[in-house]
Amino acid sequence: MKRRDFIRTVIAGSAALGWPVQRTYSEEPEPIQTNRQHVVREPLHMLRDGYQFSIPEPTEFREVVIVGAGATSLFAAYHLPGVDLVCLEKELRTGGNAQRDLRDGTYMNLGAAYTDMESELIDFMEREFNLSPLLIGGYDAYVLDKTIVRNLYRDDFKGLPYSERIKEEFRRFVALITEISARLRDEADILFAGKATVDPLVRREILDLDSISFEHWLRVNNFPKEVVKWCEIYCPPQVSSFPKNSSAFICVLIMGGMQNYDSIGSWPGGLAAMAEALAEGVTKQGQGRIRTGSCVIRVKNTIDGKFVDVTYLQDNKLQTIRCRACIWGAHNHVARYVIPDMPAEQNDAFSKIEYLDISMINLCFNRTIYNKDYITWLDNAPIQNFMPADWVLNRGKTREDTPQILSCDWANPPEKRSMLLSDSWIVEQCQLTASRINEIFPGSIDYLEEIRVFLRAHSWVNYSPGYVSDVMPYVSKDIGRIVMSGTDHGSFSDSMYAGIESAAAASDRLVVH
């Protein structure tokens, strides 16, 4: 590609449409009109703003209705094989944040990226769907300006372009968070499971850490700006929060476990392979068990407490299903507007939930640009890292003339959330990303054919200070015959456990006493 042509197309939203744009080094592009498709939010925004929908009487009966078709909902549905149920998903695709896209035979990760190679989740996937992950392997790399520091942790930070004093501060940081996370982990698991305290002193330490931001914790422990900078790059996509907005406890717990990817696996396109297998499995259990394009706007227990009425919008028509039990598998901040029966204290807790918008910018090249590391973190860019999309199939291979897609984590700061609605701003972020990659790999922009941003915002829970004490006790607190799955927090493995537990709770409500 000639430099004057820059990028032929930027594909954004969930529609595959081409945007002609000017070269990175040119003037700002003219406003661009597109027919992009956003995540379905308008009906929920209407609820938030006080709009009163006219609720129709029930015209359909099911034993169970599941709100959403993300990982938790799909696990719940799969574990209710003999139950007459339906999953109502507002998007046209299932899988929640675990989705992928395909370009010229290469899958791109659009959300959830990897998981442990050995776990009960993987045992389940192998047993039920003959689905096993491929090893990722290797270590994190880190780009500072134009210097690529490979094997950051394995080489004990020796490659950093800093003084020995600063390198020693990185080592102190890793030693401290590793020690703290190891000490707190057992009690944290008990806390996350909703069980009674085993070690009161450790529980107190957890709550104290949870009450302050990670930025504050870094400052109190006198870490230099170079360590803070690393955390500001690493935390948004990995912890789903910037340090200034995040619970110190959550950041320490997650960062304390980062070392290498030698026991971590994935599939081409990330964990979407598991979500797709689950959706197919649920569909095979019975016709009509997943209904996409169905935005739930009201979930209410009947006055006699024997049923739940679930009202949803599909094709601009409101419909109500009556069921014996409903599993809430959607975002909890939506639940407070949709479930009028929600107790005031639970509603108040859910009002404190914040989300971080994370998307993937996929840079599509007609040759291989970089294939030495799975995740390479970088500074001075809208994105936080880049990953070869087909790494698990071709990791480390030398193949210069082979087309390559670099999938980039893009966590958008909360203060810039409104900018996600601006086409020209999205294009600008894509251009800045391509320009930064070209600084690191000179001439790479000449081989860039296309940039894809499938969804502008996957909403991930921002574990803000106080989340563990003020919010978490309520996320799985059921409301009558409405089972709250607690789907908002945790990994794909956590989604499995939450889905199975929700299925059991719904089954209990099907028993006629």
Where are the language model's segments positioned?
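N-terminal export signals
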Residues: D5-S26
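Mobile amphipathic helical/loop "lid" adjacent to a hydrophobic cofactor/ligand pocket
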Residues: T34, P133-K244
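N-terminal Rossmann-like FAD-binding beta1-loop-alpha1 element of flavoenzymes
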Residues: E63-V86
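Glycine-rich FAD pyrophosphate-binding loop
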Residues: P81-D101
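Conserved FAD-binding subdomain of flavin-dependent enzymes
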Residues: T106-I136
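Active-site/ligand-binding neighborhood in enzyme catalytic cores
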Residues: F192-V299, G305-F307
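Mid-domain catalytic core of redox enzymes
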Residues: T292-S407, A411, I440
